[in-house]
Curated annotation (Swiss-Prot):
This is 4-oxalmesaconate hydratase. GO terms for biological process: gallate catabolic process. Its cofactor is Zn(2+). The keyword Lyase applies. Binds 1 zinc ion per subunit. Zn(2+) binds at residues 28, 31, 141. The gene is galB. Keywords: Aromatic hydrocarbons catabolism, Lyase, Metal-binding, Zinc. Catalyzes the conversion of oxalomesaconic acid enol (OMAenol) to 4-carboxy-4-hydroxy-2-oxoadipic acid (CHA). Mediates the third step of gallate degradation pathway.
Length: 258
């Protein structure tokens, strides 16, 4: 039996198809922009419901420019960072929520872990993005990844809140840290974000508290773009200019190696 190709029928099938989703676990409220803004915007354009969890606002360690203004309080910094992150998420096409568990140092208890597991259950992500497993310059980042992985495991457990729909085994990717060599991070996946670079850079510009990083992450995207182009072959017709690097945490299961 063949399916109807009429536009109305195709539209009806699309309405009956559940929307795919993905989850980004960001230690601080700007990390998802620098490191995964392209991935978020690209998949949002592909129809994914992209959801970001910011574990903290980065109010202590990631907001130097705001603190230097003087007469600043932690509450004011948090408010500014929240506004920046929400504006960036809107540009990228993502929803965002804030756990506000603090930074420098970041600490997480069992309630935080269960809260994130509940997000997994609610979002049912097709894939997950978070930080590198190591970062000697910022201990908040590996903690975020460990939380992301442990919450994933809990959300897979039948015995956690029995009766709820468990999550499957969404692939987990570590996005690029600030200094990859020291973090023992090596990309095994390049994502072509050329088509959404304008959105990513507009989101980057929302991060007024860390303006010194705007140019740096532009250079990172250009560098990864060159490497992505090299890995598809320099004779390829694909015009890759900007890319994001990712490191997969788990093996991928496939039926085709092409």
């Amino acid at each position: 039996m063949t399916s109807c190709a009429h536009p109305h029928c195709r539209s009806q099938r699309n309405m009956n198809t559940p929307q795919k989703s993905a989850l980004v676990v960001s230690a601080h409220s700007a990390d998802f922009v620098w490191r995964a803004g392209g991935a978020i915007a690209l998949h949002a354009e592909q129809g994914y419901a992209m959801h970001v969890v910011c574990l903290s606002f980065g109010e202590r360690g990631e907001s130097a420019k705001l603190w230097r203004k003087g007469e600043m309080t932690e509450a004011k910094v948090k408010d500014a960072r929240r506004e920046e992150a929400m504006a960036a998420a809107e540009i990228l096409g993502a929803s965002v929520e804030f756990f506000d568990i603090g930074d420098y140092p970041m600490r997480a208890d069992k309630d935080t872990l269960f809260r994130l597991a509940d997000v997994y259950r609610r979002v049912q992500p097709e894939f997950v993005l978070s930080h590198s497993l190591k970062d000697p310059y910022n201990y908040d980042h590996p903690l975020a990844m460990h939380l992301a992985q442990e919450a994933r495991i809990i959300a897979q457990a039948e015995g956690y809140k029995p009766g709820e729909k468990i999550v499957g085994a969404p692939p987990v990717y570590a996005f690029e840290p600030h200094q990859p060599e020291q973090c023992e991070w090596r990309p095994d996946t390049f994502l072509d974000i050329t088509s959404v670079w304008d959105k990513k850079y507009a989101a980057i510009q929302c991060m007024a508290g860390q303006e010194h990083l705007w140019e740096y992450y532009t250079r990172v995207a250009l560098q990864r773009g060159v490497q992505a182009k090299r890995n598809v072959g320099i004779t390829s017709a694909r015009n890759i200019v900007y890319a994001e690097g990712l490191q997969s945490v788990f093996p991928r299961v496939t039926e085709n190696l092409a």
